């Protein structure tokens, strides 16, 4: 009944737990339930937000769960579009927190192409408004950085004194990264908001809050 009359369903849900078994159970159960409800309601387009490189980071339980979600969607027989996004600017400080040991942040110097959440939502909406792709589209930010360099810039912008060091063995979502694990391919749709502009707008918003 909740989906009665809906033409499109957009799934941007996330697991409350990142423990391997729990996150897999969440994405498999929620996706199966959504797809079944959509079939009953006659929904014409299932759109799911996923992660660029999830299929390249197989040591990560979270990424394996996202791949499992994608496989369920692809095999469902329902019209679908999967939007794989790079990491959001907004999560940079959380990434730093999880990679912190004392006063030092350990991150690998691999390519990183983050984007603003506003650009993510715009891209997802455009896909939802169009016909089902029955495939995957990648989206990313307009700039590439070294992963460690980007987080160093973020902490500097907010006068965070933690030191960021390049560590090739530092893990991200439980896995070591290759040079291009986190960046989209050449056909990716790119956002418009540059990092410096996002920082400026974020500081203005914080002052106004």
Predicted feature residues:
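Oxidoreductase cofactor-interface core, primarily capturing Rossmann-like NAD(P)-dependent enzymes
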Residues: 41-44, 55-163, 167-169, 173-178
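Pocket-edge positions in alpha/beta enzyme catalytic cores
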Residues: 19-23, 112, 142, 187-190
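Active-site beta-alpha turn of Rossmann-fold NAD(P)-dependent dehydrogenases/reductases
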Residues: 13, 47-50, 84-86
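Short, amphipathic alpha-helical "lid/cap" segments that border enzyme active or binding sites
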Residues: 35, 117-125, 192-200
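Soluble or luminal CAZymes and related metallo-dependent hydrolases
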Residues: 26, 30, 65, 190
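NAD(P)H-binding glycine-rich loop region in Rossmannoid oxidoreductase-like domains
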Residues: 1-41, 52-58
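Generic alpha-helical secondary-structure signal
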Residues: 2-5, 123, 153, 201
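A hydrophobic C-terminal alpha-helical subdomain
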Residues: 155-209
């Amino acid at each position: 009944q909740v989906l009665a009359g809906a033409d499109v369903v957009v799934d941007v849900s996330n697991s409350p737990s990142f423990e391997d078994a729990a996150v897999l159970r969440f994405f498999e159960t929620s996706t199966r339930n959504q797809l079944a409800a959509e079939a009953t309601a006659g929904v014409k387009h299932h759109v799911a937000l996923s992660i660029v490189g999830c299929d390249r980071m197989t040591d990560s339980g979270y990424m394996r769960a996202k791949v499992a979600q994608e496989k369920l969607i692809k095999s469902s027989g329902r019209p679908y579009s999967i939007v794989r996004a790079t990491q959001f600017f907004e999560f940079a400080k959380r990434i730093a927190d999880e990679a912190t040991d004392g006063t030092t942040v350990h991150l690998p110097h691999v390519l990183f192409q983050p984007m603003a959440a506003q650009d993510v939502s715009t891209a997802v909406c455009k896909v939802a408004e169009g016909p089902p792709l029955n495939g995957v589209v990648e989206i990313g930010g307009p700039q590439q950085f070294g992963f460690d360099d980007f987080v160093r810039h973020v902490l500097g912008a907010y006068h965070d004194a933690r030191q960021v060091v390049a560590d090739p063995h530092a893990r991200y979502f439980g896995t070591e990264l290759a040079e291009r694990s986190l960046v989209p391919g050449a056909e990716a749709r790119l956002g418009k908001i540059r990092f410096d502009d996002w920082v400026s707008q974020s500081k203005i918003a914080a002052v106004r809050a």
